């Protein structure tokens, strides 16, 4: 998967099309990413008491994972780009922007 935790991405399709956000978590086995402020859902949680007596629960708004094919990585110029790879001088794979050839 070419999108990693900490990348800035833009949503290219779906209800949040055009939204930018930072990848909070990546799920490579499921090909999904959790993006900050994107694909927000309302989750209904059961009301429960904590040990101090306070109540927690109700309707909670949180981000849901979005498929990796619906996002594109934003390069250093702030434009969405595809991701490529090249071998660096130290022999390690380095991610590059396909749009301008710079390192991501």
From Swiss-Prot:
InterPro entries: KOW, Rib_uL2_dom2, Ribosomal_uL24, Ribosomal_uL24_CS, Ribosomal_uL24_KOW, Translation_prot_SH3-like_sf. Keywords: Ribonucleoprotein, Ribosomal protein, RNA-binding, rRNA-binding. It comes from the Bacteria. GO terms for molecular function: rRNA binding; structural constituent of ribosome. GO terms for biological process: translation. Transmembrane segments: none annotated. One of its GO terms (cellular component) is ribonucleoprotein complex. One of two assembly initiator proteins, it binds directly to the 5'-end of the 23S rRNA, where it nucleates assembly of the 50S subunit. Belongs to the universal ribosomal protein uL24 family. HAMAP family: Ribosomal_uL24_B. Part of the 50S ribosomal subunit. This is Large ribosomal subunit protein uL24. It comes from Saccharopolyspora erythraea (strain ATCC 11635 / DSM 40517 / JCM 4748 / NBRC 13426 / NCIMB 8594 / NRRL 2338). The lineage of its organism: Bacteria, Bacillati, Actinomycetota, Actinomycetes, Pseudonocardiales. The gene is rplX.
